[in-house]
UniProtKB/Swiss-Prot annotation:
Organism: Aromatoleum aromaticum (strain DSM 19018 / LMG 30748 / EbN1)
Protein name: Methionine--tRNA ligase
HAMAP family: Met_tRNA_synth_type1
Reactions catalysed, as given in the entry: tRNA(Met) + L-methionine + ATP = L-methionyl-tRNA(Met) + AMP + diphosphate
Primary gene name: metG
Listed SUPFAM superfamilies: Anticodon-binding domain of a subclass of class I aminoacyl-tRNA synthetases, Methionyl-tRNA synthetase (MetRS), Zn-domain, Nucleic acid-binding proteins, Nucleotidylyl transferase
Family named by the database record: Belongs to the class-I aminoacyl-tRNA synthetase family. MetG type 1 subfamily.
Entry annotated with the keyword Ribonucleoprotein: no
């Protein structure tokens, strides 16, 4: 039975441009939606602009326009950028809408009825000139720890200290420059620390959905444990505090019912925007039963799903506040959170001074193909919270090698012969061609990888098939057959078979490269490709259209021009830009310190290095180790055999905090093959797999090393 899924992406804030860092998560979501639709599932894909809050209000004031005018303009800009990159929402709405107001008020009213709303008096800074309470980020002063000037009200960019705004020395308003005064105001709180909420969240964050899939990736679930604690010990170690859901006027947002001058905090109504956009879509369409996807009882009866694609910076809101709000207001909770990491460029934080803080608009306006980036981001996505590094040289190499050199090359080498020699009509397919059989055989592997959002694994398998298809062409040499008398029939079969292989590859690449797939469908004169139930070659006598160039190579000069277009002047920064430049200097300092720490190792000789036997290993089995907090048991194929059978190695790897075992099976990694076996209480570990982590423990990530496309089990790393 087809699945019925509501899919959302995180709502971008209506106070800035879409940049490449944003696009990581949106492209991941769009690929998954396209794959599900190719499988025949019903998917509603919605998003919206997150429009409320002090920053929007102040930016509109600075521009001399209303907040409504600002968010209207930004809405058009955001939708244009998403469309250019093939992110095809069914509806792109706004949180400043009648639907969102209705949902926000309903959720609040039901939480209040459940006795989960409190009011308390709090003391906070107030700007006497602007006559407004100041959020932490709109208060500046000297750090109470290190004395650094021009620091925000919640943390110091120079020393990293966290503190309350009232601890700042010589504070001033970042809005007016005035010295703020302390005033008391009544605020509204969602009682997240209530035992009912804590018990629910412990179960929800650690559990599985109706399909048996984890609601949270293993890394996300482990992070939630830090906040929710262990219910078997005392008070459980719960560190959740009640959540302030109100802000004082002036504020751009929705006023709280029965509380004049008090507004819903932006993070209360922002995720509710998912429901609002969906209801707005239903009103446009007229054939969607909204409550089947949003009401707790009806959603369970209808068997619908709700999947959120978000960045790890907003995990706290989506894994704690959002499901608790929904649960106690009578709405359905998310089926799954798909959390992506941050984007770095060439191994470092995006930087305006280096030109790597790249907006979507500048990328498109410089003439770069958005599908180059879609493909590259997909190759780096593995369904975990790992950060994605955009290595610009690697992107050039991957696109040119994989898409142009392998994939498009199949059609460009064979289509001309069909047009010139056979009037555009295909012949019979070669029944002995193994590439077609391999393509059919790989369907399950690729489908599973797409389902798990392990797009990198899917694309590695697809490129393996592309290698087989190219090998078929190379073995039969159609360019030589065309010169030989009496080889017309053979030439016809070879070129027709190659184009069937090309069709198969296009089908698999379609979720990632929808625009290119559409061109191929037109070239081959076929119906839109859907996930196959059975595999059939393109029929004999089928007429294809003349071949037109499908994709150009990436030139390094295009990348250099893009960086230059995004590089800010290195002249002294204007006062308004001091904050950003200070942050960048601090980030670059941290990066330099980390690099220094990680490279300060004694030299070894080449003879020492050659003693280490590094092999490519395929993970054929992975499972948790009972009684071990950090270990996963891996079974590895490094090309060894015994009595004609593959001999597998067992390795215990301390990567449990970063990986779900199910996502590791089939993946290639690097293993130290000649490490002496080590006897542990769980068994014997017969080697070591390689992973990266921060040398100074400031970053908690663990990143398993994976070789590039083309590597195979047993190959030596030299």
């Amino acid at each position: 039975m087809p699945r019925k899924i509501l899919v959302t992406n995180a709502l971008p804030y209506a106070n800035g441009d879409i940049h490449l860092g944003h696009l990581v998560g949106y492209i991941q979501g769009d690929i998954w939606v396209r794959y599900q639709r190719m499988r025949g599932n019903t998917v509603h894909y919605v998003c919206a602009d997150d429009t409320h809050g002090t920053p929007v209000m102040l930016r509109a004031e600075k521009e001399g326009i209303t907040p409504e005018a600002l968010i209207g303009r930004v809405h058009g800009e955001h939708l244009r950028d998403f469309t250019d990159f093939g992110v095809a929402f069914d509806n792109y709405h706004s949180t400043h809408s009648v639907e969102n107001r209705a949902y926000a008020e309903d959720v609040y009213t039901k939480l209040k009825a459940a006795e989960l709303i409190d009011t308390r008096a709090i003391e906070q800074f107030y700007d006497p000139v602007k006559e407004m309470f100041l959020p932490d980020r709109f208060i500046k002063g000297e750090c109470p720890k290190c004395g650094a000037a021009d620091q925000y009200g919640d943390n110091c960019e120079a020393c990293g200290a966290a503190y309350a705004p009232t601890e700042l020395k010589n504070p001033h308003s970042a809005v007016s420059g005035a010295k703020p005064v302390l005033k008391t105001s009544e605020h509204y709180f969602f009682r997240l620390s209530d035992p009912r909420a804590v018990a629910f969240l412990r179960e929800w964050t650690r559990g599985t959905n109706a399909a048996g899939t984890r609601r949270l990736q293993v890394e996300a679930a482990n992070k939630m444990k830090e906040w929710l604690g262990d219910e078997t010990v005392g008070d459980g170690g719960n560190t959740l505090s009640d959540w302030d859901i109100s802000r004082d006027a002036p504020y751009f947002g929705f006023e709280i019912p029965g509380a004049p001058g008090k507004y819903f905090y932006v993070w209360l109504d922002a995720p509710i925007g998912y429901f609002a956009s969906f209801r707005n879509l239903a009103e446009q369409r007229g054939d969607i039963a909204v409550d089947d996807f949003t009401d707790a009882v009806r959603a369970e009866t209808a068997g619908t799903e709700m999947v959120h694609f978000i960045g790890k910076d907003i995990l706290y809101f989506h894994a704690l506040f959002w499901p608790a709000m929904l649960r106690f207001a009578g709405y359905r909770t998310p089926t799954q959170l798909c959390v992506n990491g941050f984007l770095t460029v060439d191994g470092a934080k995006m930087s305006k001074s280096r030109g790597t803080f790249i907006t979507a608009r500048s990328y498109v306006s410089r003439g770069l193909n958005p599908e180059w980036l879609r493909y590259y981001f997909a190759t780096k996505s593995n369904g975990t919270m790992e950060d994605v590094d955009l290595s610009l040289d690697d992107m050039v190499a991957k696109v040119n090698s994989d898409l142009v050199g392998k994939y498009v090359n199949i059609a460009s080498r064979c289509a001309g012969f069909i047009a010139k020699r056979f009037d555009g009509k295909l012949g019979a397919s070669d029944p002995q061609a193994t590439a077609d059989f391999e393509a059919a055989f790989a369907a399950g592997t690729i489908a599973h990888a797409y389902e798990e959002r392990d797009y990198g694994r899917a694309l590695r398998e697809i490129m393996r098939l592309a290698d087989l298809a190219n090998q078929y062409v190379n073995d039969h040499k159609p360019w030589e057959l065309a010169k030989q008398e009496g080889q017309e029939a053979h030439l016809h079969v070879v070129c027709s078979t190659a184009l069937t292989h090309f069709r198969d590859l296009t089908l698999y690449l379609k979720p990632v490269l929808p625009a290119l797939a559409q061109k191929v469908e037109a070239f081959l004169a076929i119906d839109p490709l859907v996930w196959p139930q059975t595999w059939q070659p393109l029929p004999a006598a089928h007429t294809i259209n003349p071949y037109a160039h499908l994709m150009t190579r990436v030139e390094r000069k295009q990348i250099d021009a893009l960086l230059e277009a995004n590089r800010e002047s290195l002249a002294p920064a204007a006062p308004a830009a001091k904050v950003a430049s200070s942050q960048q200097r601090h980030a670059e300092k941290q990066q330099h310190e980390a690099q220094s720490a990680e490279t300060a190792m004694p030299h070894i000789s080449i003879d020492d290095f050659t003693k280490v036997d590094l092999r490519i290993a395929r993970i054929v089995g992975a499972e948790h180790v009972e009684g071990a907090d950090k270990l996963i048991r891996l079974r590895l194929d490094i090309g060894e055999s015994e009595n004609g059978q593959a001999k597998l190695r067992q390795v215990f790897a301390g990567i449990k905090s970063a990986y779900d075992p199910a996502t590791l099976v089939g993946r290639l990694t690097v293993m130290v093959a000649n490490l002496a076996p080590r006897k542990m209480k769980f068994g014997v570990s017969e080697g070591m797999v390689l992973a990266a982590s921060s040398a100074d423990d400031k970053s908690s990530g663990i990143y398993l090393l994976s070789p590039d496309t083309g590597a195979a089990s047993g190959m030596r790393v030299k």
